[in-house]
A protein has these predicted regions:
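Intrinsically disordered, low-complexity non-transmembrane regions of multi-pass membrane transporters
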Residues: 1-21, 163-164, 218-235, 269-286, ...
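N-terminal signal-anchor module of multipass membrane proteins
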Residues: 1-81, 89-99
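Juxtamembrane interface elements at the cytosolic ends of transmembrane helices
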Residues: 2-3, 33-37, 41, 178-189, ...
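Membrane-embedded helical hairpins/re-entrant loop segments and their flanking transmembrane helices
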Residues: 15, 41-79, 251-324
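Hydrophobic, membrane-embedded alpha-helices of multi-pass small-molecule transporters
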Residues: 16-28, 168-180, 197-198, 213, ...
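Generic transmembrane alpha-helix signature in multi-pass membrane proteins
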Residues: 37-41, 90-99, 125, 154-156, ...
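Short, non-helical or kinked segments that cap or interrupt transmembrane helices
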Residues: 53-54, 75-88, 129-138, 195-200, ...
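Membrane-embedded alpha-helical modules
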Residues: 97-217, 221, 329-437
């Protein structure tokens, strides 16, 4: 396949070229990796030390996961320049799980459900008629719509501000607005480097304004902690399990398996490799398998599920560098960043409105991606029915959770998430309506 690549998948770029390409990838993914743990920690009201450690371990786990994807071990890994990082898709179910059983239940449920994606990687061709693009589009749309609420809460000051009466003050909203407008401005700049780092620049400006307004509490920093190294400790917070959390998180693993398939396909195409035949199927299967395995590994090291980042496919196009060996540099950078507590500490002190201004836009793009997937399909009578019943029930539960207050605890815990309710409805409705026809 003819391409404009400077370095192909198996080429080994010189150190300088590889390092420069790796830095551009790092700019594109850094904020996306640390945002989920920051949002989850804020929602669960975790202290600075625990938040900092979770951020650091997200960077560490993302580095290890990226190395596995690029290197490939047996059937695990795509052997492409596939970058992995903490997934946004799991935030809603993880927060709901954390409210019930804390951090141990989060890690236990995420690890227990991770084999679902690994199994899907070996049986995906049999599930394609069940988890269709319409179904996956509906779930992605529901994920985005449910996360927008989380972003708005952060813009207002977070859950802590709701408790202490400082929610939605003019300072909080001004900080969030500055970040949002800055990200939009830099994203529309002609300079490609400003575009690539638009979120980082927006966060820096928001952080500066928050500091000037006295919103950054530096007293929470522990100097001794900052001077030390983060030693990854497997199962530091323990693990727990319940069925309802397993089902809610397991459903998202099904969707990330589909997303990973699309990401590996796009990466293969950009890298000038075939997107059909045995070699292609081996890459897709290995990529999805690694997605699940790496999410399990992330749980072991006190981090949240990982997924392949689609934005890095754009960086490959931009740089013309598809060499998987560049992934080794990226992996090393992420691991090193995760070992220094000061990185996690600086971002754990970030006020909620700063994060909210950036994540509001990110979550909106997740919802937009769901709309794009749905609209890529021909929407006939059957598809309209599936879409209508799934969104009605999914959004209904999300907007009015009290509708389940009289239901048994087992039912309430499973269907309290709009993503789970809407996703399961989409799968069942898609099967039933197709059978009826």
């Amino acid at each position: 396949m003819k391409t404009d690549l400077i370095y192909g998948v198996e080429d080994r770029p010189p150190f300088k070229d590889a390092l420069f390409a790796a830095l551009q990838h790092l700019l594109a993914i850094f904020v996306a990796i640390i945002t989920p743990p920051l949002i989850i920690a804020s929602a669960l009201k975790l202290d600075v030390e625990k938040t900092s450690f979770l951020v650091s371990m997200s960077l560490f786990a993302s580095g290890v996961s990226t190395f596995i994807q690029c290197r490939r071990f047996g059937v695990i890994g795509a052997r492409l320049l596939c970058i992995q990082g903490t997934s946004f898709s799991f935030i809603g179910p993880i927060i709901a799980t954390g409210m019930v059983g804390g951090v141990p239940l989060i890690f236990g449920s995420c690890m227990a459900a991770a084999p679902i994606e690994m199994i899907v990687s070996r049986t995906f061709k049999y599930l394609r008629n069940i988890i269709t693009p319409l179904v996956s589009g509906i779930v992605v749309l529901l994920i985005g719509l449910s996360l927008i609420k989380v972003g708005i809460v952060s813009c207002g000051g977070g859950y802590a501000a709701m408790d202490n009466g400082t929610f939605a003050t003019w300072e909080n909203l001004s900080i969030a607005a500055l970040v949002l407008l800055s990200v939009l401005f830099f994203n529309r700049c002609g300079n490609k480097y400003l575009r690539m780092s638009s979120i980082v620049l927006g966060l820096c400006l928001g952080y500066g304004l928050a500091f000037a307004l006295g919103k950054v509490d530096m007293s929470a920093l522990n100097v001794e902690m900052l001077m030390s190294f983060n030693i990854p400790q497997p199962f530091k917070y323990g693990v727990d399990f319940n069925v309802s959390s397993f089902i809610a998180i397991g459903l998202v693993y099904l969707i990330t398996a589909i997303e990973a398939t699309g990401d590996v396909t796009a990466n293969s195409m950009i890298s000038g490799l075939p997107i059909e035949g045995d070699s292609y199927l081996k890459r897709v299967s290995g990529g999805v398998m690694a997605d699940g395995f790496n999410s399990f590994l992330a749980g072991v090291f006190n981090s949240f599920p990982n997924s392949i980042f689609a934005q890095n496919n754009g960086i490959i196009q931009l740089t013309g560098v598809a060499s998987r060996y560049v992934g080794y540099y990226i992996a090393a950078m992420l691991v090193l960043l995760g070992l220094f507590p000061i990185v996690g500490a600086v971002f754990s002190l970030m006020p909620d409105p700063v994060l909210g201004g950036a994540t509001l836009l990110m979550f909106g793009t997740v919802a937009a991606a769901g709309i794009r997937i749905v609209s890529s399909q021909e929407i006939g009578r059957k598809e309209t029915l599936v879409l209508a019943v799934s969104l009605s029930l999914g959004l209904g539960v999300e907007l009015m959770p009290d509708v389940l207050q009289q239901a048994p605890e087992a039912i309430r815990s499973i269907f309290s998430s709009g993503i789970t309710t809407g996703g399961l409805t989409a799968i069942i409705a898609n099967i039933v309506i197709r059978v009826k026809e």
